Amino acid sequence: MGLNLGVIDYGMGNLHSVGKALERLGEQAVLVQGPEDLKSVDALILPGVGSFDPAIENLRATGLIPHLKDWGNNNRPLLGICLGLQLLFERSDEGSKDGLGLFQGAVERLQSHPNERIPHMGWAPLTVERNCPLLHSDDPTPWVYFVHSYAAVPLNSSVLAATAAYGNAAVTAMVWSGRIGACQFHPEKSSAAGEAMLKRWLHWLHQGAEPVH
C-alpha cells in the first residue's frame, strides 16, 4: 500500500532538509500549503524554524489551523519537528498566540545555567522515557542535534517519550500520544540516529500506524 506523506509549508520550515531525508529513505512528500492539499495525504510532518507567534500567524494565513486541530483530534498521524513540536502545545512563553493545543501544557524558556548556553545548540544524548514509533528503550543511546531556546512542559508527563539533559535538568526532547508525536531536535540533521528514527516512523506508518497509548 502506498503512503502519501505531506510536509506543511507555511514559510518557516526547513523543507529542503526534511525532503532530502525522506528521499534517502525512498519516500516522497507533497507540500501542504492549504486545506485542499490535506485531502491527498495520509500522514503529516510539521517542521519549524523560528519564533512561535510568527509561525502561528503564518499557519493562520494558510487556513490550516482548524484543519490541523481536526487532524489531531481525529488522531491521524502527525510528526512535529523542532518549532513544530512547540506549536502542538497550548501556548508559549515566547509569544502571546494560542498554539494548536494537540498536547496539553506550555512551552517555557530554558533556564540559564552556568555551564550551558542559550540557545541550546549541538549534539546531545537522549534518555528514553517510553517506547514510541521513533525510539525504543532497547536502542543504543542516540545522539541528536538540537537548536532551541524553549522547551515544552507537558501537563501530563505520560506523553514524554524522551528527554535530554540541559544543565541540571531534563528537558523535553520528544512527545508522543496516539498517532501524534514530535521531536524538539532535528532528526533530519541527526545523522544515522535521526535517519534510523525516521525510517522506523515510516515503517510504523506502512504497517498501519498502531496508536501508542
UniProtKB/Swiss-Prot annotation:
GO terms for molecular function: glutaminase activity; imidazoleglycerol-phosphate synthase activity; lyase activity. It catalyses: 5-[(5-phospho-1-deoxy-D-ribulos-1-ylimino)methylamino]-1-(5-phospho-beta-D-ribosyl)imidazole-4-carboxamide + L-glutamine = D-erythro-1-(imidazol-4-yl)glycerol 3-phosphate + 5-amino-1-(5-phospho-beta-D-ribosyl)imidazole-4-carboxamide + L-glutamate + H(+); L-glutamine + H2O = L-glutamate + NH4(+). Its EC number is 4.3.2.10, 3.5.1.2. It comes from the Bacteria. Its main location: cytoplasm. Residues 4-211 form the Glutamine amidotransferase type-1 domain. The keyword Hydrolase applies. The active site is at C82, H186, E188. One of its GO terms (biological process) is L-histidine biosynthetic process. GO terms for cellular component: cytoplasm. Keywords: Amino-acid biosynthesis, Cytoplasm, Glutamine amidotransferase, Histidine biosynthesis, Hydrolase, Lyase. Pfam families: GATase (PF00117). InterPro entries: Class_I_gatase-like, GATASE, Imidazole-glycPsynth_HisH. It is found in: Cytoplasm. The keyword Mitochondrion does not apply. Pathway: Amino-acid biosynthesis; L-histidine biosynthesis; L-histidine from 5-phospho-alpha-D-ribose 1-diphosphate: step 5/9. IGPS catalyzes the conversion of PRFAR and glutamine to IGP, AICAR and glutamate. The HisH subunit catalyzes the hydrolysis of glutamine to glutamate and ammonia as part of the synthesis of IGP and AICAR. The resulting ammonia molecule is channeled to the active site of HisF. Heterodimer of HisH and HisF. This is Imidazole glycerol phosphate synthase subunit HisH. It comes from Synechococcus sp. (strain CC9902). The lineage of its organism: Bacteria, Bacillati, Cyanobacteriota, Cyanophyceae, Synechococcales. The gene is hisH.
